[in-house]
A protein has these predicted regions:
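N-terminal secretory signal peptides that target proteins for export/translocation
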Residues: 1-3
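Sec-dependent N-terminal signal peptides
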Residues: 5-15
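Sec/Tat signal peptide C-region and signal peptidase I cleavage site
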Residues: 16-22
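A contiguous strand-loop segment
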Residues: 23-121, 141-293
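Short, well-ordered beta-strand elements within core beta-sheets of diverse protein domains
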Residues: 125-132
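Catalytic cores of secreted or luminal carbohydrate-active enzymes
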Residues: 296-318
Length: 343
């Protein structure tokens, strides 16, 4: 879909709980694209998902109207919230003002899941699209909703974009009995590209850059309270505090970001050991300045990436079979003689 300045690719928008960890999102700033548009993408990469295109027509609502919130993944009723007076027209993951929101689930620390929360990540996306016009307004709507009604889901990375700006926001709950969430949102520079793929990506937070960074007031203090962080504010990493790396996070998630980045930055091979599972190595940046501008077709190609041209090329390993097929059946891991392998 191409509309005046924001381009969004969406596919496989119905997620089961097991497949929520199979999403990839790419972001392109307006000065990093060939036509000056902001671009984001969204896909849940699995053979057993079926795509849907949602539509909420614009509407006016009477004073005192309410809205039932149903978990997007499962259809479970979560609660009721106040409705606003007017809601915008939404098709898929974009509204009439060309605000678009997508996500990838990183999960994070299990003890931070709040089973009493009302706002799950899917409802948060689609309700916000009905209520906000810009990316900055969307961030406020989303964070206000979880503060008032509680956050039900695990950790999420959201792509939030309008015709002018692209943002990455990461959010995780506070655990049972504690309403709200801790979160941080960082604007992607106009001349840069970013990506996320089911692993928290925000490291140090530029606390003094109020124009390009927004965060919950307790994002650091809550981590200290929970024993997740003990250092100085300047050394705080959202990822390290709320979603520590493991092998799957690097090999299965950060590797997807790396394979996209390396198409536009010749220095990315310095992170090869990192994405192969060595968490002691320096992590990749949240965004990079590409060596050339990206077109819509480049983003489409990035979403079809199978690590071609790298040691991880999925058409060349044992799982590809005799026909060199890059696709893998779920689950992605299997055990032989007690040893676990990734397919």
């Amino acid at each position: 879909m191409k509309m005046k300045g924001l381009w969004l690719a969406c596919c496989a928008l119905v997620l089961s709980g097991a497949e929520a960890m199979a999403c990839t999102g790419l972001l392109v700033g307006k000065k990093a694209s060939t036509d000056g548009s902001v671009m984001i993408s969204y896909a849940a990469d699995s053979h057993n998902l079926y795509g849907e295109m949602y539509h909420w027509p614009a509407a006016n609502w009477p004073k005192g109207a309410t809205l039932d919130v149903v978990e997007w993944d499962t259809g479970k009723p979560l609660g009721t919230i106040a409705q606003v007076e007017h809601t915008y027209n939404v098709v898929g993951n974009m509204n009439e003002h060309q605000l678009a929101i997508t996500e990838s689930t990183f999960g994070g620390r299990r003890e931070l899941h709040n089973p009493e929360g009302i706002m799950d990540y899917g409802s948060l996306i689609y309700i916000t699209l009905q209520r906000a016009k810009t990316a900055r307004e969307a961030i406020k709507v989303m964070t206000d909703l979880v503060a008032e009604y509680g956050y039900y889901s695990g950790g999420e990375t959201f792509s939030i974009a309008d015709k002018q700006e692209a943002w990455v926001m990461e959010m995780i709950g506070k655990g049972a009995g504690r309403k709200g969430a801790v979160w941080v949102a960082i604007r992607i520079p106009d001349d840069c590209i970013s990506a996320h793929a089911n692993q928290s990506r925000i490291q140090q937070i530029p606390f003094n850059d109020k124009e390009n960074c927004i965060y919950s007031p307790d994002v650091v203090s809550f981590a200290r309270e929970m024993g997740f962080f003990k250092g100085k504010d300047a050394d705080f990493s959202f990822q390290q505090a709320y979603c520590p790396y493991d092998f799957s996070a690097l090999r299965g998630c950060e590797a997807r970001v790396w394979s996209f980045f390396r198409e536009y930055d010749s220095t990315m091979d310095q992170y090869t050991d990192f994405i192969k599972g060595d968490a002691s190595k320096k992590p990749m940046p949240l965004y990079i300045k590409p060596n050339r501008k990206l077109s819509v077709q480049d983003v489409q190609k990035g979403m079809r990436n199978h690590y071609e041209g790298t040691d991880l090329d999925m058409t060349k390993d044992a799982g590809a079979g005799s026909y060199k097929v890059p696709y893998r059946w779920r689950p992605m891991t299997f055990k032989v003689d007690g040893q676990e392998y990734t397919n």
